[in-house]
Amino acid sequence: MLHTITTITEEIVNLLKDDPVRPEIPATDRINSNSRIYMLKDGEQTKAITCVKFLEAVPTGVEDMVGLVESATTAVFYTIWSYRPGAGRDLIIAAQKSIEAEFPRIQTYVTLSPKTEMARRFHLKNGARELRENHSTINYIYK
C-alpha cells in the first residue's frame, strides 16, 4: 500500500539513513509544501521509498532543488531505494498515480539520477527514456 509522508517522524528519519543516492539531504528538505516522500509498505514492512520535489522546471543538479515554488509543473524523483525486488518499480507507478490525483498541474515526471549503470538500467527498464545528460546527473523522463 502506498503511503504519502508529509510529517517527519523518528521512523522516517531512521529510514532516510538508508538512502543510497542522496543521504546528505535532510528530512526537512524532503517534506515540505513542495516535497513529499512516498513509501510502499506491506503491513508494517517497508518495501520501497522515493523522494519527490515539485518544481517549475527540470533540474540539472541538487542545487536546482533548493527553495519553494508557487506553481510547480514538474515532479522530480531524486532518490529511490527498495528493500524488496520489484518494489521500486511498483512504487514509481503508484507514486505517479498519486501525484496525478493530488497535483493535477504536474505535467512532467522526471528523475535527477546519478550517472550510474544501475540507475540507467532501472529507469529504462521501467518505461523511462533519457531526457538529458548533465554535468553530474542524468534526467530520465516518465510518461
Walk through the language-model features, giving the residues of each.
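Short amphipathic alpha-helix that is part of the acyltransferase structural core
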Residues: 1-29
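A short helix-loop-beta-strand connector motif used in the catalytic cores of GNAT acetyltransferases and
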Residues: 27-48, 53-56
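Conserved acyl-donor/pantetheine-binding loop and adjacent beta-alpha core of acyl/acetyltransferases
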Residues: 51-75
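Conserved beta-strand-loop-alpha-helix junction that forms the acyl-donor binding cleft
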Residues: 82, 109-121
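Conserved acetyl-CoA-binding loop-helix of GNAT-fold acetyltransferases
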Residues: 82-101, 125
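Short, aromatic/basic amphipathic alpha-helical patches
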Residues: 121-129
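Conserved catalytic-core motifs of GNAT/GCN5-like acyltransferases
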Residues: 129-141
